Amino acid sequence: KNSDIAFIAVGTPMGDDGSADLQYVLAVAKSIGQSMQKRLIVVDKSTVPIGTADKVKATIQKELDERCSDLKFDVVSNPEFLKEGAAIADFMKPDRVVIGTDSDYAKEKMKQLYHPFCMISDRFISMDIRSAEMTKYAANAMLATKISFMNEIANICEKLGADANQVRIGIGSDQRIGYSFIYPGAGYGGSCFPKDVKALTKIAKENGYTAKLITAVEEVNDAQKLVIAQKIVTRFGEDLTGYTFGIWGLAFKPGTDDMREAPAIYVIKELVSRGAKIKAYDPKASSEAEQHYLQGV
C-alpha cells in the first residue's frame, strides 16, 4: 500500500491454442487497483503479449473508478532477461535493462531503481511500451532461431560428411555471428523458448501476418527432439525389446531441474514405446523427471 513501485512477476502459461494466459497478470493488476493508496508505478516483468500493458492499465483504472479514486499510476514494461540457473548473477549484473514507458516520471524512477545494478548508461534502454513487450519475444525467438539453424546445419553436415563442430567453429569465429547458441544438439526446451515462439507466431497470425521463419524454427525443433531416437532405431532396428539405454542428463539445461519441454522426455518415451528399457540420471532433475514427467517409464 505504501510502495512507490509495484512489480507484476507471475507466470503466463501457454494455453491450448498457443497464446499466453494472462489471468494471473490481470488478477494482480486488479489487486493493485483495489489496494493502492498513492501514486504508483506498476511494472510488468512477466513475458506478455504486445498490448498487455493496456489491459493492465484498464484493469487498474476500473478498480480505481469503483473506489471513486483519482489516484495516478503509470504502467511500465520491464521484461526480464534472467538465464535459468544464473538468475541472481544476471540480476546483480544485467547486460541491459529495457524499460517501456510513455511517462518521464516513471522513466526517471526506474533509472533510480536500477542505478546500483546498471551504472553504465548505455545499458539502460528506454522505449515505448509496446516495443518493450515485443523485445522479450523477439530476443527469445532470435535465440531459438540460432539453435534451430545450427541443428539444421548439423543435419546437413551429417549427410555430406562434414564435421558440424568444425563448421560451428568456422562460423562462430565471425564476430557478426559469435559462438552463443550455435551448438548442435537435441533441440531447445524449457519454460520460455517453446512458449514464447508459439505465442509470437499466434500474435502475428491474429494481426494478419504469417511468421514463416518463426514457424519453421518451431517445426525444426520439434523434429530435432526425435533425431537421437531415430539414430538409435537406425542402428538397432525398429524393435528395441531387450535393449537398455543409458541417458545422462534429463533437464532441458544443465545445472537446473527444469524438465519442461526437455528433449530427453521425447527421446525416452520414443525408445520405451519401441520396447527399450532406460536407465537415466541427472544430478539435479532425476527426482523431478520421475515424479512429474516420466511416471511409469
For the regions a protein language model found, what residue spans apply to each?
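Structural/interface elements that position substrates and couple domains in central-metabolism enzymes
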Residues: K1-V297
